[in-house]
Each structure stands twice: as structure tokens, then as C-alpha cells.
């Protein structure tokens, strides 16, 4: 029971390619084929991997050079990528609840699949990204409270939902279950600390973490793209819902003249809808 699964394999600098399989499992494909079919008429949803046939297959494949990833310092990659050797990184993205935001109309905006009642318990027991070297667990990575990839810090810089805007969407630290597999033979510069508790904090390990974040960002980009254009489709079909959502966002981002106008528009929309509901109730009372 998961929303996304990402499997990344790197065979070392001789090959130089990341082989990545991304499986989408968050949205109801049957509803995409019917109720949300207009999504695939959008120009932004007419190229790989966003076409309907790719959603129907669920899993798609990417090949990327490490240099294709979004890395803070690509010059460092040229000198150090050979030092961390082969690795495999597999992770699952899973929300705690059917929707990961509390905005009005969120469930109508996105055709979510139902989730298992046991998911929250499973997440609590397994959350985090663990490291295994030659099939043995390397602690403390992935233990409760050990956010060694600093996913929580990334999220706090921009805690917006995946459908709110393009770019800047980040996974939450409590939404990922993953494992990194390395070997002592291929990853000689990823060395144990003298205490045997963790790996030495050196340039190679820093780069390795940046590469893992770069792989996570491939998932984030995909989910952000899909959810953003689903949100655009909903706003096109529900302009009052868009006005309310803009007002909600404006209340969180501080005062400006533009935000003031959005809040006023949102207030007027809500008042109009309440008046319409009151008229409906009056008619029912008079029946």
C-alpha cells in the first residue's frame, strides 16, 4: 500500500548511468480515463511520462547520468563520483491519510485511490531511509528521529502542497520509507567511523547524500507536475473553489495589497455560497 515507488540502480562510473523505475499508485486510473480525461488534453500532459498510456502502465523507466541530477556542486561530482561506486536506492512515498493537504475541495481536485487502514501504523514502524552495507544494517541511519538526509529541513523551507505551484514541492520526512544498499568492495571511500556507529562525514559521503536527494527530486518533480495540472483543471471547472483557495493561501503569506484583494474575493465568494444555501433551506422549509 503506497502512493509511489522509486527504484534507482547505479553500476558505477564505468557505466555512469542511473537506471530508474518510477511506479505511480496514488491516483485512480479509471477516474483519470473518464472524469479527468480533459487533463490529458493539456499541452503539458501530452509528452512522456505524463500521457494517459503511461499512467495505465503504472511504471515508467528513466536513464539519467548523475550529472543530470539537480546537485548543488556538480564540479565535485567529476572528481568524487568514482569513490562511492555501485549502489541501489529504493523508496516508497506514502501519505498518512488519503489527502496530504487540508484545503477545501482537495479530494475532488485529485482522484485519489483509497488507502489501507493499516498504512499509518506501517509508516510509523518503518519511516525513514536506512543504509545497508553487504546486507547488514548501518546504524543509526533511518532510525526514529534520524533525518540524515535533512528532508525535514527541506520541507520547512516550502511546506506547500504538490498541487499549489510548479517547483519547490518537497516530500515530508514522515512520508518516506526507503533503503540504500552499498558494498564495502565498491564503496571503499564510504568508510565506517572508528566507533562503528555510522559512516565517516567526508566529501564522498556528502556527495552521496546529494545524489540521493537528486533521485528523490525526480519523484518530487513528477508528482508536482501531475498534481499541479490536476489542480489547474479543477480551478478551470470550479472558479469559486479557486477563489477560496487563493484566499486561504493569502492568509498564510502575510499582508500585501494583492493578498488583501484575494481575501476580499474569497470572503465574497463564501458569503455568496452561504446566501445560496440559506435560500435553498428557506425553499425546503416552505415545502
List the predicted regions and their residue ranges.
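Interdomain "switch/hinge" adjacent to the Bergerat
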Residues: 1-128, 132-144, 191
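Charged, glycine/proline-rich intrinsically disordered loops and linkers
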Residues: 40, 149-162, 246, 250, ...
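Generic serine detector
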Residues: 47, 67, 97-99, 116, ...
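GHKL/Bergerat-fold ATPase module
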Residues: 116, 124-228
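Signal-transmission coiled-coils
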Residues: 205, 209-287
Amino acid at each position: 500500500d503506497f502512493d509511489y515507488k522509486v527504484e534507482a540502480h547505479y553500476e558505477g562510473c564505468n557505466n555512469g548511468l542511473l537506471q530508474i523505475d518510477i511506479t505511480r499508485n496514488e491516483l485512480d486510473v479509471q477516474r483519470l480515463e473518464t472524469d479527468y480525461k480533459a487533463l490529458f488534453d493539456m499541452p503539458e500532459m501530452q509528452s512522456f511520462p505524463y500521457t494517459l498510456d503511461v499512467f495505465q502502465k503504472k511504471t515508467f523507466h528513466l536513464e539519467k547520468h548523475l550529472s543530470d541530477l539537480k546537485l548543488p556542486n556538480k564540479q565535485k561530482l567529476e572528481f568524487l563520483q568514482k569513490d562511492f561506486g555501485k549502489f541501489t536506492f529504493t523508496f516508497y512515498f506514502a501519505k498518512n491519510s488519503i489527502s496530504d493537504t487540508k484545503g477545501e475541495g482537495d479530494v475532488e481536485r485529485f482522484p485519489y485511490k483509497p488507502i489501507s487502514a493499516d498504512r499509518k501504523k506501517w509508516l510509523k514502524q518503518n519511516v525513514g531511509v536506512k543504509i545497508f552495507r553487504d546486507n547488514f544494517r548501518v546504524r543509526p541511519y533511518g532510525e526514529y528521529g534520524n533525518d540524515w538526509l535533512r528532508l525535514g529541513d527541506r520541507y520547512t523551507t516550502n511546506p506547500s502542497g504538490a498541487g499549489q505551484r510548479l517547483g519547490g514541492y518537497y516530500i515530508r520526512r514522515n512520508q518516506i520509507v526507503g533503503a540504500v544498499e552499498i558494498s564495502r568492495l565498491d564503496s571503499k571511500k564510504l568508510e565506517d567511523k572508528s566507533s562503528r556507529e555510522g559512516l565517516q562525514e567526508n566529501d564522498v559521503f556528502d556527495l552521496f547524500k546529494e545524489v540521493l536527494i537528486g533521485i528523490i527530486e525526480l519523484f518530487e518533480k513528477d508528482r508536482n507536475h501531475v498534481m499541479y495540472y490536476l489542480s489547474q483543471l479543477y480551478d478551470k471547472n470550479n472558479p469559486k473553489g479557486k477563489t477560496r483557495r487563493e484566499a486561504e493561501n493569502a492568509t498564510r503569506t502575510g499582508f500585501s495589497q494583492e493578498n488583501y484583494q484575494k481575501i476580499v474575493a474569497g470572503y465574497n465568494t463564501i458569503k455568496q455560497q452561504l446566501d445560496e444555501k440559506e435560500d435553498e433551506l428557506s425553499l425546503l422549509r416552505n415545502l
